[in-house]
Amino acid sequence: EIMPSLVGSEMCIRDRSYTVGTDEFDEALSNVSSRIKKSAPVQKSITVNNGMKANQPGSRFIDFTIENGNIDGTPVSLSDYVGNGKYVLVDFWASWCAPCRGGIPGIKELYKKYAGENFEVVSVAVWDERAATLKALEEEQMPWPQIIDAQEIPSNIYGFTGIPQVILFSPDGTIIARDLHGKAIDEAVEKALKK
């Protein structure tokens, strides 16, 4: 594949990172110059690809802390919830994301269905302004823990480029499933809790 320009090459690599698996991305990357690999868009794609590779089902969760991530502005870590003896469904979302907001009623139903069981939901707001997140939280009335102002930290660590991104963690913090949407969320939670 001939890539005539730096910009064109960056776009090809970035687009490929969204549409192929991690091994195919690595193979495509091996065919480009070091100059292209060092460009900011390609470095971002490499970060996301590495995060995806490191966080497949069976991998232990990677912690992060958001300094003002609680609604009251205090620090909060993913490990405050994940790896503490409960199944945890983590929903990465943003106030401006229509599919994210559209999925909230289904997550509310799951939360209600499994209340009192060994199950928790945590929402993590990414790529969003604090005020917009707080307004959406007021509108949506999600009764589970919230981490806000996370920006790109989770997407870089967990290797995702689109939201909603829903990941189910086991009680010890191992990833059970990721990239969950719609009925797949219900099925993954039900299967995990039946064990």
Question: Where are the predicted features?
Answer:
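Single conserved hydrophobic/aromatic residue that forms the stacking wall/gate
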Residues: 1-8, 12-13
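Long amphipathic alpha-helical scaffold segments
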Residues: 25-60, 64-66
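A short beta-strand-turn-helix
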Residues: 65-88, 157
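Aromatic-flanked redox-active Cys/Sec active sites in thiol-based oxidoreductases
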Residues: 86, 91-97, 126
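Hydrophobic beta-strand anchors of alpha/beta hydrolase catalytic cores
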Residues: 89-90, 121, 166
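Conserved redox-active cysteine motifs that mediate thiol-disulfide chemistry
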Residues: 92-109
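Conserved segment of the thioredoxin-like fold in thiol-based oxidoreductases
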Residues: 109-163
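Thiol/disulfide oxidoreductase modules built on the thioredoxin-like
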Residues: 138-142, 149-193
